Design a protein with these regions (language model features):
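Contiguous beta-strand/loop segments that form the cofactor/metal-binding neighborhood of enzyme cores
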Residues: 180-253, 270, 282-289, 323
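N-terminal Rossmann-like dinucleotide-binding module
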Residues: 1-46
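C-terminal helix-rich "cap/oligomerization" subdomain common to oxidoreductases
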Residues: 66-68, 215, 282-324
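Beta-loop-alpha module in the N-terminal Rossmann-like domain of NAD(P)-dependent dehydrogenases
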Residues: 16, 49-108
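Hydrophobic residues in well-ordered beta-strands that form the structural core
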Residues: 52, 92, 117-119, 148, ...
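Predominantly a Rossmann-like dinucleotide-binding segment in NAD(P)-dependent oxidoreductases
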Residues: 123-193, 201
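Active-site loop of classical SDR/Rossmann-like NAD(P)-dependent oxidoreductases
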Residues: 269-281, 297
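Rossmann-fold dehydrogenase core element
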Residues: 104-122, 143-147
Length: 324
């Protein structure tokens, strides 16, 4: 059983803790927050053995094997390095870092130290991903030519979205999901990536649209928003029909339609704890096999997603303070 630690005690950490508590392959061992009382309350609520008032104390605990990083993505780079320097395997929330340079550095560092480091982009690990792959491969919609995907939440008032010093904006927080959806369906070998964004007064993107063009002529048309609520749908268009994915952020079902727009097949999502369990199980498997990356989200894919977002931000003139 892998002893897990969590860095950060916010909303996403609570979801992970509630998930870990229901799993047999890991144990809820330690949690750290910048405030000890908060960490202690978290530990009591979710059944963790240890609570720490600093991240440094948690990584110094030799019992901790795998650390889940649930801090704002502006801090992922330093927290990944902190964990790796203390010999911990790492599952880090998305966005993995703020740019490709940071990602490349910590991934190289993990390989050098012989430690697992992987990005917690949960959609990559879910079983419905294989279901979607199988449906497309069956040829039921013929040759796919285009996909659309969107993700929008009413989150513009949240600190992590508003503030440039926290690497805020819609792109890194929610735009990463449509981008990953496109990469999972059509691959990550793109010929061209372009985008348009509306920036806030503080200089981060409130909402955006992104277009990927592939060497074989396929296109992915994507958008994300922190100010508008979207239907979260992904649609893949073929020459014999189309596929609708209900909620690209946590698949709630897949529906297949023919050329007359008649429903021909549907697939339900299997019962899950929260959906977070799949990325944790992937880490447990990788650690058990002595692997340094998870096949569900290889390092090269994490680097490509960061590269895409770097290019989009370059087009928008969106630079974070820590990059200047």
């Amino acid at each position: 059983m892998i002893k897990t630690g969590i860095i950060g005690a916010g909303r996403i950490a609570k979801t992970m803790a509630a998930t870990l508590r229901e799993m047999d392959s890991v144990s809820c061992y330690a949690v750290a927050a910048r405030d000890y009382d908060r960490a202690e309350a978290f530990a009591k609520k979710y059944g963790f053995c240890k609570a720490y008032g600093s991240y440094e104390e948690l990584v110094q605990d030799e019992e901790v094997q795998l650390v889940y990083i649930a801090t704002p993505h502006s801090h992922h780079y330093e927290h990944i390095k902190l964990c790796l320097n203390h010999g911990k395997h790492v599952l880090c929330e998305k966005s993995f870092t703020i740019n490709e340079g940071q990602a490349a550095e910590v991934l190289a560092m993990a390989k050098e130290k012989g430690l697992l480091l992987t990005e917690a982009i949960w959609t990559r690990y879910m079983p419905m991903r294989k279901t979607l792959d199988d449906v497309i491969a069956s040829g039921i919609i013929g040759k796919p030519h285009m996909l659309t995907a969107n993700l929008g939440y009413l989150i513009s008032g949240k600190e992590r979205i508003m503030r440039p010093e926290l690497a805020g904006g819609a792109l890194l927080d929610v735009g990463i999901y449509p981008l990953n959806f496109a990469a999972m369906v059509f691959g990550s070998d793109v010929k061209e990536i372009t985008g348009t964004a509306v920036l806030t007064e503080l200089g981060v993107d409130a909402q955006n649209s992104m277009t990927l063009v592939y060497p074989d002529g396929k296109m992915a048309v994507l958008n994300s928003s922190s100010v508008g609520l979207s239907d979260r749908r992904g649609v893949i268009y073929g020459d014999k029909g189309y596929i609708e994915v209900e909620n690209i952020n946590n698949c709630e079902g897949i529906r297949v339609y023919d050329v007359n727009r008649n429903l021909t097949a549907s697939y339900e999502t299997p019962k899950q704890i929260s959906g977070y369990e799949y990325e944790v199980e992937a880490c447990v498997r990788a650690i058990g096999n002595g692997e340094l990356e998870c096949p569900e989200m290889p390092h090269e894919e994490t680097l490509k997603m960061m590269r895409w977002m770097d290019e989009l931000r370059r087009q928008w003139g969106m630079v974070f303070p820590m990059e200047e």
